[in-house]
Amino acid sequence: MLRPATPLAVLLAAAFGLLLISVLSTPIIKAIPLGEYVGVTFGVFGYCINNNARCSPIEIGYDEGLAAALADKNANFDLPSQARRTLSTILIIHPVAALVTLIMFAMSIAAHFHSPSHSARYLLIVFIVGLLNFVICLLAFLVDVLLFVPHMAWGSYLVLAATILVALSGLVACAMRRTLVSRKARKKRIEENAEMSGENFYNRQAQQVTPPAENKPTVPVVSGANGAVGDKLPSFATYEKRDDLSSEDRVPLTANSPANRSPNAQYNDPNRPDGQFNQPRRAPSGRDQYGNPMEGPTDSYGVQRAPSAERMNPGARGGYRGRGYGPPGRGGYGYGPPPGSRGGYGPPGRGGYGPGPNGRGGYGPPPRGGYGPPMRGRAPPPGYQYDRRGSPAEAYGPPPGQGPYGQRQQSPGPPSAPGYGMNGSTPTVSSAAYGHQHTPSDDLPRAESPPPLPGTEPMPPVGQAVAMDAKTGSPQVPQNGFTAMPPPNRFGGGQQFRDSDADIQGMVGLQQGITPAGQQPPSQRHQTLMSEPSHYSQEGPQYVPARQNWNDQRSKTPGAESVIHPSMMPQPLNASRTDLSISRNSPGPGGAPARSRTSEYYEDVAPRFATPDPSLRGTPVPGQAGGRIPPPINLPAGGPDFDEMPDGSRSPAASERSTFTSISQRGINPRWNPPPPSMMPGYGPAPQRRPNRNDMLLNSNPDFELPTNRGGRGGSPPRAPGTSMIPGSAYPNGRL
């Protein structure tokens, strides 16, 4: 093991070897001379003449024979022969130098131990011996120089090398001692300083009283039950943590799809007789596709639906076989009120096409009664979808827009109805949700259900997300309810919408009047004579794009030509000049100029927020003001002609790079839920509508009162006085 004294030992070992070689010179080893001249070799203990043919005995100093041998050659040495013979005795210094070097080498070996190496005195002795050894070695070399100059041999130079090594060993011994002394002096200074030595710290620690340890009761050790003897499990749990491959901060917010916006993925089912697409059904969950909690059963779009009248009360008598939920009917289209009441749509009709299933009358004149007030039960839940069944007239001939005889089809509803655009063969959610079994009575024809009037449907919750369909602009419905998308130029302009422009296609489809395939206009639904009270069941005006009939109103308004110039009306951007002239000069069926269907220009207004044109409203409900013409738009006479603007001057209808071109075209965040009503100023319960005078008159007229239930099982209490239908509504959905 290396120690600080190791270099010292190495140097002294080398010096001792060199001095030993010089001592063993001629005549002991004839090959090692200290000096050589005219065939005579010199050593420490004698000499040899005639090329080592004859040697002197081993002794200290040279005898008289050397002088005789060098009688004629003595003048060639620097010293006379007598002086050289006297100095030859000093050659004994070579063995002394070797001996001192050996002693110093032994001391250096002892300095490798702990006690001598940490003793300043021992190292001091080593250093002193080293100095003495250096002096002796130096003296031996000087004797060689004096005796043999200028005929020195290589043996004398070995003594010089040994002298140098002894000097270096003395320096090493001095350094060792100096290091040790400095270390001890520093330690002494530290011991004298109480703060540096830590004495004060330990004194303070000793003064602090340690609280006695509490003796906890020992629990007896039971083999296999408790105790550290049988518990060989580690006292702590170790876990391995893997580095995340991707940080959450680097994941885009739109990486996860919020919901399946089109759950009705269509596929062919070979088991279906009609060969149409099936509607897949997902398992019910506690939330809809937008994350909003639901209380009742939902359809495939996550919209809450309530069961139909027959599904909610399968044990009721009559059903739609002529009796409904009220008294036995004697004909007419009425099949009973919606769920929650027991009155019909009026008194039974008389006469008509003949008896219906289980009924005693046929298709008679229109009923003369009003709507029966609600009796037992409650109003249908919001979003209730009335049962859509075929009309009894199918047995006698299909009405306009219906299928072949005996085939049941779903009665088309308004665009706002939940069943809009859906296949007639699609099963309802209410029947699937309540597990109603198919009975023979389900195949019987039934009169169509009038849709609710506009404004009577419950307002959707504020803040609920609504996904717009790509073609209709309404909540998504199966795609088979619309005609297939034609080749490019469907929306005009020679530009095809991409698949990502779903919202734009839906808005353009609504504003250009594209209707679902296979359905007829609302004006063709009612084929019978309607009485004055029956106007309550008429459908509201269909949505008409804004500014479509302004030209018609302008033509009927005196001075309209002077207010708005025809060139200043919005025209399609990609329409040619010929199309513009035709659209301005050729009046349509309603007297308004015909709009070009090749236009890409559309109003950037959501359909449900657009105000219908007053000119297209039907007969106004009694008690309400008639249609009003919007005020004229006073534009400067010399204003720019928007029809003359080339493509690209306005906001484009579609974009090649981005799905959205303006803020109004951006979709609604499907995951946004509004705060409680108490935290949203301006949002509160809708004000109650004032009762209509005509409704009050009809309710007070006994001719429009429905009789109480007759023949019901167990009977039922008579209708409570004071009940009436909701003002402004065509359905007896609840109490006022």
UniProtKB/Swiss-Prot annotation:
Q: Which keywords are on file for this protein?
A: Cell membrane, Membrane, Transmembrane, Transmembrane helix
Query: Where is it mainly found?
Result: membrane
Report whether Iron shows up as a keyword of the record.
no
Q: Which Pfam families match?
A: SUR7
Residue spans with biased composition (Gly residues)? 316-363
Compositionally skewed regions (Polar residues) per UniProt: 201-210, 254-269, 473-482, 513-540, 573-586, 656-667
Q: Where is this region: Disordered?
A: 201-226, 240-500, 513-736
Which cellular component appears as one GO term in the record?
growing cell tip
| Entry's localization field | Cell membrane
Name by which UniProt lists this protein: pH-response regulator protein palI/RIM9
Report the function annotation for this chain.
Answer: Required for the proteolytic cleavage of the transcription factor RIM101 in response to alkaline ambient pH.
The Swiss-Prot or TrEMBL record describes its family as follows: Belongs to the palI/RIM9 family.
Tell me which species this is from: Pyricularia oryzae (strain 70-15 / ATCC MYA-4617 / FGSC 8958)
Gene for this chain = RIM9
Extracellular membrane side: 30-89, 144-151
Q: Where is the composition biased (Basic and acidic residues)?
A: 240-251
Transmembrane stretches, by residue range?
9-29, 90-110, 123-143, 152-172
Q: Which residues lie on this side of the membrane: Cytoplasmic?
A: 1-8, 111-122, 173-736
Mode of membrane association = Multi-pass membrane protein
Composition bias of kind Pro residues appears in: 448-461
